[in-house]
Amino acid sequence: MYHPVVQVLIGLILVIILILGFYHLKKKSCKTDTDCKDNGHHCVRGTCTDISCLEAVKQDIKGINLDPSIRSCNYTPGFYTFNSTTADLQSPFGKTRIYYGDVYATWSSVDYCQSLCLQHNGCIAWEFDDEKESPGQGSCYFYTNSHPALKNSNDTTIMGIARNIL
């Protein structure tokens, strides 16, 4: 048969393959957060994970440029949302800013701005600025460049970057 050293190497390789196979089976694949609801995780790049939203953004959106003062975000269906954040208007991303107009919705102007982005061809990010005096009214902007550059802003802006598409 084979020399004992070769048999040990073959055995070692088989053990490594088994360990990797079990690890791969343990990782649950997903398309949306609801696929991960049984253990409280979120879907990031097709895998259920418990990493922070900010770490997920860095993994999911390659080449994103985040201002160091941005320390958190929130998972929402279809988007990562950032409070008090805007686009860096000097960046190529910021230069694609499209002013949709002032929006007002009785249920949620932020959600309305997000839904308008979903309907706009090429929109990969939205921004809602609640600078108006009337509650729930503000300006809605869209972005189409796939290399986001975000910076900290005043307390009236909310920004959303699309998940799992860039």
Swiss-Prot record:
Q: What factors induce this protein?
A: Early structural protein.
Report membrane topology.
Single-pass membrane protein
Give an example GO cellular component term for this record. Answer: virion membrane
Pfam families per record: PAN_1
Does this UniProt record's set of keywords contain NAD? no
Where in the cell is the protein located?
Answer: Virion membrane; Host cell membrane
- Show which residues sit on the Virion surface side of the membrane: 26-166
Determine the domain of life of the protein's source.
Answer: Viruses
Please indicate the ranges of residues that lie on the Intravirion side. 1-4
> What keywords appear on the UniProt entry?
Early protein, Host cell membrane, Host membrane, Membrane, Transmembrane, Transmembrane helix, Virion
Name the residues that span the membrane. 5-25
- Enumerate the Gene3D superfamilies for this protein: Hepatocyte Growth Factor
Q: Which family does it belong to?
A: Belongs to the asfivirus envelope protein p22 family.
Q: What is this protein called?
A: Putative membrane protein 164
This chain's source organism reads African swine fever virus (isolate Pig/Kenya/KEN-50/1950) (ASFV)
